Amino acid sequence: MYIIGENINSSNGRIRSALEKGDWDSLMELVCTQERAGVQAIDLNTGAMGTRETGLLLELAERTQQVTDLPLVIDSARAQTLEDAAPKCRQKGLILNSATMDDASLLPLTELAAQLGSRLVVLSLKNGSAVKGGDEMAEELKKLSERLKALNLPRNRVWVDPVVLPLAYYPDDVGELLARLEQIKAAGFSAICGLSNISFDMPRRRALNRALLPVLMAHGLDAVIMDPTDRVLMDMAKAADALLSEGDGVMDYLRYLRSL
């Protein structure tokens, strides 16, 4: 399980305030806290900063690379912002987060990923809505496969997100989410998700996040963007990986425990 730290995100009021004030010390401390918690990469999102989004993402990426060698996940709904920020990311393992399945997003970002040799997250969203499982998902995954082939972009560099919808507003979607995840995996793609979406606008958010993660892992999830400062959630992620892994999951789990 590839774990990406979600905490540097301007949708969080505390992070937005720090970005507005230029409080880089507290932001970099949070980067380091996530690294100590055991993540493999750091997500950086300045999307709530309006016209300052791109400039702040560039500075955030530069400063983050001064305090950690972990790969960066540059996170924006705007393809141009990702195109502007990507050349500033010097560390190996860059992840572009994210394209949708709309041509206006998918075409430039698959080309950028091919040029840079980076990974790319593709959200199963089109025209602002989640792609439905079944024939609609099959058609979109086929188009994605054809696009990757045309660019010689290896499939293993693309993670498809089945899109976790908030339980508060889509209480019947979890079964559909699992079906979308299974269809993505059956098509030969790796799968990633933003875990905390499930608990948006719900009480006791951490309980819902903790409940969903092992279910998704059992259905083939490969990577997750989540809060690594929730120690119980991190423990569950590592333990579930040990139980489900056919490789070095147990040894990874023991190494993780020794690092605490």
Predicted feature locations:
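Alpha-helix-loop-beta-strand connector modules within alpha/beta enzyme cores
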Residues: 6, 51-91, 174-193
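Active-site-proximal loop/turn and secondary-structure-junction residues that shape catalytic pockets
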Residues: 8-10, 46-50, 78-80, 100-102, ...
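Glycine-rich, proline-tolerant flexible connector loops at the mouths of alpha/beta enzymes
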Residues: 35-70, 163-171
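Active-site-proximal beta-alpha core segment in soluble small-molecule metabolic enzymes
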Residues: 84, 90-122
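Catalytic alpha/beta core domains of metabolic enzymes, predominantly
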Residues: 108, 114-259
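Hydrophobic faces of well-ordered beta-strands that scaffold small-molecule active sites
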Residues: 2-6, 40-44, 72-75, 94-98, ...
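Active-site mouth loops of central-metabolism enzymes
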Residues: 3-29, 53, 97-103, 127-135, ...
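A structural motif
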Residues: 36-39, 69, 91, 118, ...
